[in-house]
Amino acid sequence: MYNENPIKRRASTRIYVGDVPIGDGAPIAVQSMTNTLTTDVDATVAQIRALENVGADIVRVSVPTMDAAEAFKLIKQQTNIPLIADIHFDYRIALKVAEYGVDCLRINPGNIGNESRIKSVVECARDKNIPIRIGINGGSLEKDLMDKYKEPTPEALLESAMRHVDILDRLNFDQFKVSVKASDVFLAVEAYRLLAKQIVQPLHLGITEAGGLRSGSVKSSVGLGMLLAEGIGDTLRISLAADPVEEIKVGFDILKSLRIRSRGINFIACPSCSRQEFDVINTVNELERRLEDVITPMDVSIIGCVVNGPGEALVSDIGLTGGNRKSGYFDDGVRQKERFDNDNIVDSLEAKIRAKASIINGRIPVQDLNK
């Protein structure tokens, strides 16, 4: 399949969140955030593990109180994936979770306090080799910037970010990444473009408060897709009012669609029409459900008739072309003598895909499967 990637990624420095490299050409990391009460340790640990199971590289956890900080200590002890502590208002919470092995601190300088408090957090992070994310958000800009610009603008987001980048620079701290999120696509995109020209640190991408599963996925795909196609971005989070597991799936789907990072199966499926020889929609939905555990990069085309089916199958790892009672099967673009009974397509195709994944895995170094 045509898979040339014309994207030239923006050059940046590298930091590490736990053992996950960020920036300087490292694979773009996909992260999410728990939506449980952090003080409910069991529920939070369960959600983190669920996120890890679908491929999350990093998970952010809100730590709003000292009680939550104590819970974070227990959560960290029971999980393996790198954890970011999300800190607002009380800088002392950042100091506390640093004692408990946090992998990264996310602070919003607009509400964390004065420069001396930021300095305390930075000195602690330096001592413990913990990176920081400066998280600028259009909904929580500093009062003086709102007075100056009257509303969130790309320039306001940039000025807020640079104000706090300058603080870290003065403190000789360079282990950080930056985000300038907004809920409006054009506002966020332009802010990131401006920021990308000003600093060399990694950028964390996101359209904040994007919306529900459908609308938020679309908004995030448009905004992040624009930036990623320009080579901007080193980590990302899809902010959805939905199960956080869906954020990881959508994140990987965006990267997969741009051929930046392939994880799992890329299904190529027709929307179906009266020419379909089998139930395309239910077939695809069921295969997506059954094969969520397959992380091997693979293109699978499922087309309901012979109009476009053979052409798509020629450039797929596995292809299915609808036929009368039995459908044609392609392997690596070659039509096979074997045909699938239309009443048993899901089981037959699942078996072929899993077998193909095993073959591909034998050709791909294990460490590359998660790239």
Swiss-Prot record:
Family label: Belongs to the IspG family.
Protein name: 4-hydroxy-3-methylbut-2-en-1-yl diphosphate synthase (flavodoxin)
Record pathway: Isoprenoid biosynthesis; isopentenyl diphosphate biosynthesis via DXP pathway; isopentenyl diphosphate from 1-deoxy-D-xylulose 5-phosphate: step 5/6
InterPro entries reported in the protein's UniProt record: Dihydropteroate_synth-like_sf, IspG_bac, IspG_bac-typ, NO2/SO3_Rdtase_4Fe4S_sf
Catalytic reactions of this protein: (2E)-4-hydroxy-3-methylbut-2-enyl diphosphate + oxidized [flavodoxin] + H2O + 2 H(+) = 2-C-methyl-D-erythritol 2,4-cyclic diphosphate + reduced [flavodoxin]
Residues binding [4Fe-4S] cluster: C270, C273, C305, E312
Known cofactor(s): [4Fe-4S] cluster
Swiss-Prot/TrEMBL GO biological process terms: isopentenyl diphosphate biosynthetic process, methylerythritol 4-phosphate pathway; terpenoid biosynthetic process
EC identifiers of the protein: 1.17.7.3
Alphabetized HAMAP family for the sequence: IspG
